[in-house]
């Protein structure tokens, strides 16, 4: 159905907002009282404020904000392009894979290695695979446009494309093998994806609200 993909992403993003709030609140609680959840040790889990704060960051940035941005993009870009989303089924299905990738990142923030497997890189790899599927879906949608895409659409496309472009630049330049280069690439991507994505959505929303789409 039209809009099913966008709804799926936004609903799951809302669910991650609840978990992000729980992780962040629990982290702040443990910072105030480190022994508040010591009873969980009998279940084999030792709650740690820093680890829960990391889980809150992953759930907020990748689970909530990223899913909201991508979900909104599945609504905005087809509207601006004067066409339908290339594949609602693809948009719907990959949202669940993205949720799994965020879950892997959250688990990795608590235990980075399980059975000798590094969890965080696995979650990041899964995350990037889903992002490539999202980008392909949006590019196919743009290819079928019936009118010129306004600025909000281009801002959102720039946000989505920033990850693979920066990954290629990092590999070609050799920055991927350097700790400083990895840090810089990560923060440039974060700035581009979140800023351009939110800016595009805000510009579209303000244009619609003012009656000047």
Show the residue positions of the predicted features.
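Hydrophobic alpha-helical transmembrane segments of multi-pass integral membrane proteins
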Residues: 1-213
